[in-house]
């Protein structure tokens, strides 16, 4: 009996050692080449996996304006798996519970996934529109426009959701690395497809270890979007549309490849400025812009104004604009908070179908009878 017991103990010890060796084994970085999720509309990310590994790699390309050949990888660890040898990026345990959002767009994405309770910090809470966040201002901390690192440490975040602007993010990432706080750069705002922007919610669903929910929620958005777009497929009249107002003696105009130009086209209208075919907005001279507003049938996204009188007060020349004379000016600021937040810049990223419905109602009211959700008619 004693001999059998000794053998049994030795057998169990061997199994324990072998099991430990297997669980601690690192999968090589080169093995992460299987497509776990390939976006249909977004171009800035993909999710990769490997055989015999529950962990994944999120690869993000050029996540800020002007970035070229910038590739970032994030290891999403599951079952205690270690990052592959040679991997130098952030390691984020799947199922992140404490999340800091440095853009309100990420609040909207987590809201769409039903995961607002994971948010422990935001940037500029007074400009947030989400009712849940506003109702929990005592417990959800405001990180400020520039990161408050002392406050951040106290929150013990599992991940910080960042957006990059030029090379200014270098100091932020260096500090987060020093503090051993995981982070990920989101690049949804650079997507040229309205649906591509919304598809970034799948990245967040990967972080919270519920990829299936992200895919399920997202796949309904294109269905609604294309059902609305189909309403304009056979129209014969395409009114011309002008964007924006001056900023610092120049007038920034979207590219013909931009998500706004695509929304305008899908809503059955015609973007009036076709000279910019790049992948970014461009400033044009004021005289050129004044010439365009003389001709455009509609004028939208006109800053912070809420009436035609306020718009004309910005510049008396605006009184001569065709859309001002014909009262066809609309602004994307119908959903303002008392503290200055604008829900368009927060939730529209995950509701491109609602934005499209608004625009169809504006340009072709006979096709959509619903009152606009994001847009106000300036009177």
Identify the meaning behind each predicted range.
Residues 224, 228-315:
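Flexible, glycine-rich surface segments
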Residues 1-19:
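Sec-dependent bacterial lipoprotein signal peptides
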Residues 115, 136, 179-180, 267-268, ...:
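Short, structured coil segments at secondary-structure junctions
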Residues 21-105, 213-242, 309, 362, ...:
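Bacterial Sec-exported substrate-binding components of ABC uptake systems
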